[in-house]
Amino acid sequence: MAIFAATYKEGDPVWQSFLRYKTDYSKQFYFFVIGALIALFILLTDSKFFSATANLWYAVGIGVLFLVFPFHSRVKGTESIIRFGGFQFQPAEFCKVCVALALAKYLSQPETNFTKTRSHLIAAAIVLFPALLTVFQSETGLALVYCAFFIVMYREGLPASILIIASVIAALVIATIVVEPNLLAIGLTIMAGLVIYTMRRSIRRRRGILLIVISLWFVCVGIQRFAVPFLFKHVLQKHQVERIYDLFGKDNPYSKGTDEPDVVSSSRKSETQSSYNVKQSKIAIGSGRFWGKGLLKGTQTRYDFVPEQRTDFIFCTIGEGFGFVGSIVLLGLYLVLLFRIITVAERQRSTFSRCYGYGVASVFFFHIAVNVAMTVGLAPVIGIPLPFVSYGGTSLLTFTILLFVLIRLDADRQMVLR
C-alpha cells in the first residue's frame, strides 16, 4: 500500500497495471507472490536441511558476491546489482541469509569455544568478509547491516569489553566531526591528566598503569588526528562523508581535496542532496500531523518532492498519509515482530536455531531502526530498505526467507540441530 501511495499517478488503470508488470507496485505484488511460494517451499523442507547446508549456502553467497565485480550494472551510484533481463538482483541482500546460517552453524559446533579469542576472530571473519566485499561494490549501507550480527555473538558470550571499546571509538569519531580538532586534542590531554592524577597512588605502586594511560592517550589522539581524516579522505566516498556531516549540520571539510580539514567551512552548513532528502522527508512526515492526510492525498509524496520515497524514504509516505497514528501503529507492529522473534529464539533447544533466530532479529532491528532514524534526520542517509514495506524484490524475498526459515526451525524446536 505504501509503494502504491508513493508511485501511483492519477489516471493510471490500477487493475490493468497489476497484471502488466509496468508499475512499481505491480512488480512488488509479483515479488510478494514469489515470496509466498518460497515461504511455502521452506515450510515443507526438513529443518535439518538448513543446518546441514549452512556452510554451502555461505560459499554460494560469497561466490555470487564475487560475480558482481565482472557482471555488475551501475544503478544510482551502486555497483552491487546484477541484471537478468528485466530483473535486478542484489547479492549483498541475499547474502545476509547465508551469513545468518553460517554464523549459527559455527557457533553451534561442539568444538567452538566462544570464550577464546580465536573463536571470536573466526566468527568476526564470517561476518566481515562479505561486508568487505559489499563495501567494494559501493554499497556501504548494506555492509553496515552485517555489523548487526555482532549482537548474536554478544548473546553467545562475546565479552562486553569489546562492545564498550567499539562504542568509545564511535564516540571519538563523532567528537572528531563535531569538535574542532585542536580543541578535542586538548580535551583528550586534560582527560588523560585527570586520570593520572586520580590514580596517582596506584601508579606509584604499579608503573605499568601510567604506561597504559599514556598509550591510550596516543591511540585516541592518533584516531582523532590521523585515522578519521584518512578514513574520510581516502576510504569513504565523497557523498558518504557528506551524509555523515549532514547529520551533525556541518559541511564536508574534505570536499576541497586537501588532506587537512577546513574547520571554518565545516562550521557553515550548505544544503547537499542528502540533507535535501531528509529535509523533504521531515516536511512530509510533519505535514501528516496526527491522523494523516489519507491515502493518495499527500502533497509531498504525491508530487515527488521526496527523492527515493518508494525505497529508502518510504516511511515518510506512511507518515504523511496516515500521520502520527499510522506511524506509531507500524512501529508497534515492528516491535511486536521483534519481540516475537526473540521469544522464539530463546525457546529453542538447539544452539543453531537460537543463534539463527537472534541473527534474524538483529538484521530486522538494524534495518528498522536505521531506516526510520534516517528519514527523521537522526541517522546518516545510508540507503537501506524498511522490511516488507520498501520497494525492492531482492529485499522482500530476503526478509521472507529469513523469517520463514526461523518459523520452520521453530516447528522442530525440540530437535537439537548442529
Residue ranges of model-derived segments:
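Hydrophobic alpha-helical transmembrane segments of multi-pass inner membrane proteins, especially
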Residues: 3, 10-270, 316-376, 401, ...
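Gly/Ser/Thr-rich beta-alpha loop segments that engage phosphate groups in nucleotides
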Residues: 79, 143, 288-290, 294-300, ...
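Glycine/serine-rich anion-binding loops at beta->alpha junctions
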Residues: 86-98, 138, 289, 293, ...
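Transmembrane helical segments that form the transport core of multi-pass membrane transport proteins
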Residues: 257-259, 264-271, 286-303, 307
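A conserved mid-to-late transmembrane alpha helix and its immediate loop/hinge
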Residues: 278, 282, 291, 295-344
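A juxtamembrane structural motif centered on a specific transmembrane helix
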Residues: 348, 371-418
